[in-house]
């Protein structure tokens, strides 16, 4: 019996120009006209299949994107916080981890250099051992990952001594970042050394960053230009959140360039951990007040801690709380990314039939905040707190680690937080209107990368 024989071929590997040769090689025809017809039919089918393969074969970019998504789905839910400050002690045990960040995460955060640190010996011995391979070779354009730690760091300003590392005369940034980790031990830290618009924008322009935290500003909250243009980019354009420290004095926060703009979460402080009673301590009429006194890592050793106070530490503690909330919701709803890029629809959580925006996070924080009960001494702070309108001094109220669970429950819609009393709503609506009015007209100058606090007025808020 005459028949037509054919074998399987990989059409994706066959150039279109050689189709005739392929068909000739793969078809073994008999003598009858029926066999000729069968051969032509099979040839037609093969040609059609080839065009389908070409039409539906994914390009390299599509394959790369799919591979990246698969890789990210193999890792845990995460959140990225960007403290902006003096520098950070990458050698301290507080920032150590057995976890190694996946390569796709490093790529997405723009990492240009990896510094394998020495983890034996004193702080000085470790630093000396790593000078040649790491510290002496860093530039302002480097974004550096430190394996064995939770830290990716950069120093775009290039000011001071050793880039990224907290210098012996500093220490502020190490404590600030320690406060973030205390609230969310699994936070990915994208640390930026500096306190300029350039430093803030280094974090704002990172798609994976969720929260930017700044703990510096003008002494007494005097109305001078600061980082407000850059934080506006981060929140309004990039859909992130910004936590900004109010001044440590009772001066109003509304005109403060760090805590005052309506797009920022302005944070005052109250003492809690090292004090027998809670005390309202700082800036009046903020968004919220958070824990002021904390036990935080030293900048010049590997395992020491110190107790310190200030809105400088209340602010990153709040950033860590937000990070914990985001990470929890992402894990619950299958969101393997971070940030609020256009690809994520501008949403900080973009999961399975579930999204959360920066506005919704702020609303949940405001609803969860609370005013101290009768166990709190209203006269023990820097000034007495009005029992009638505490919002004028504490904003929506106090926020600490106890707020995490109700915030998550409200956002995942398992337990809704009730509305705040009408007088609180009215008070904070007035606050928002004043901030929008003030910052809508000031500063009048166009956005400028070069805007920076005058050194005469700038101070860290501890």
Could you say what each language-model-derived stretch is?
Residues 1-67, 462:
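Secretory targeting signatures
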Residues 71-179, 187, 207, 373-379:
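Active-site core segment of subtilase-fold serine proteases
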Residues 73-77, 182-184, 205-206, 234-237, ...:
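Extracellular/periplasmic catalytic domains that process cell-envelope and extracellular macromolecules
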Residues 85, 256-330:
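Extracellular S/T/G-rich loop segment that most often corresponds to the catalytic His/Ser-adjacent loop
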Residues 86, 147-223, 334-336, 342-356:
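Subtilisin-like peptidase catalytic core
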Residues 87-99, 180-184, 213-216, 220, ...:
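Sec/Tat-exported extracytoplasmic proteins
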Residues 90, 165-175, 191-263, 274-276, ...:
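Substrate-binding/access-modulating region of protease and related hydrolase catalytic domains
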Residues 210-213, 327-462:
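C-terminal subdomain of the subtilisin-like protease fold in secreted/lumenal serine endopeptidases
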């Amino acid at each position: 019996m005459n028949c037509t024989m054919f074998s399987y071929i990989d059409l994706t590997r066959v150039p279109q120009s050689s189709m005739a040769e392929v068909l000739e090689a793969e078809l073994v025809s008999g003598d009858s006209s029926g066999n000729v017809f069968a051969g032509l039919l099979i040839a037609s089918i093969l040609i059609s299949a080839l065009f389908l393969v070409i039409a539906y074969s994914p390009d390299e970019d599509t394959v790369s994107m799919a591979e990246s998504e698969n890789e990210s789905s193999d890792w845990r839910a995460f959140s990225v916080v960007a403290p902006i400050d003096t520098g950070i002690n990458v050698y301290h045990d507080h920032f150590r981890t057995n976890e190694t960040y996946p390569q796709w995460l490093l790529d997405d955060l723009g990492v240009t250099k990896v510094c394998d640190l020495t983890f034996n010996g004193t702080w000085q011995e470790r630093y000396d051992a790593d000078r040649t391979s790491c510290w002496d070779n860093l530039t302002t354009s480097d974004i550096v990952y430190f394996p064995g730690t939770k830290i990716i760091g950069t120093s775009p300003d290039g000011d001071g001594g050793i880039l990224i590392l907290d210098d012996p005369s500093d220490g502020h940034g190490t404590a600030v970042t320690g406060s973030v980790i205390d609230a969310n031990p699994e936070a990915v830290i994208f640390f930026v050394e500096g306190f300029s618009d350039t430093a803030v924008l280094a974090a704002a322009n990172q798609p994976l960053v969720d929260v930017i935290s700044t703990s510096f500003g003008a002494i007494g909250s005097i109305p001078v230009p600061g980082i407000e243009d850059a934080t506006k980019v981060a929140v309004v354009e990039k859909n992130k959140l910004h936590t900004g420290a109010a001044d440590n004095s009772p001066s109003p926060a509304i005109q403060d360039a760090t805590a005052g703009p309506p797009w920022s979460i302005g944070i005052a402080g109250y003492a809690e951990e090292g004090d027998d009673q809670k005390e309202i301590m700082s800036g009046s009429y903020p968004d919220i007040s958070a824990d002021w006194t904390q036990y935080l890592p030293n900048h010049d050793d590997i395992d020491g801690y110190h107790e310190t106070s200030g809105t400088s530490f209340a602010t990153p503690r709040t950033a860590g709380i937000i990070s914990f909330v985001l990470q929890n919701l992402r894990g619950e709803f299958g969101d393997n990314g971070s940030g609020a890029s256009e690809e994520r629809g501008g949403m900080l959580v973009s999961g399975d039939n579930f999204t959360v925006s920066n506005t919704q996070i702020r609303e949940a924080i405001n609803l969860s905040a609370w005013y101290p009960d009768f166990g709190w001494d209203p006269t023990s702070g820097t000034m007495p707190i009005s029992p009638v309108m505490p919002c004028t001094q504490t904003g929506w109220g106090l926020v600490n680690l106890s707020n995490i669970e109700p915030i998550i429950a409200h956002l995942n819609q398992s337990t809704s937080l009730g509305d705040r009393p009408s007088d609180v709503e009215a008070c904070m609506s007035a606050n928002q209107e004043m901030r929008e009015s003030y910052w809508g007209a000031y500063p009048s100058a166009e956005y400028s990368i070069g805007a920076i606090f005058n050194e005469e007025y700038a101070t860290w808020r501890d």
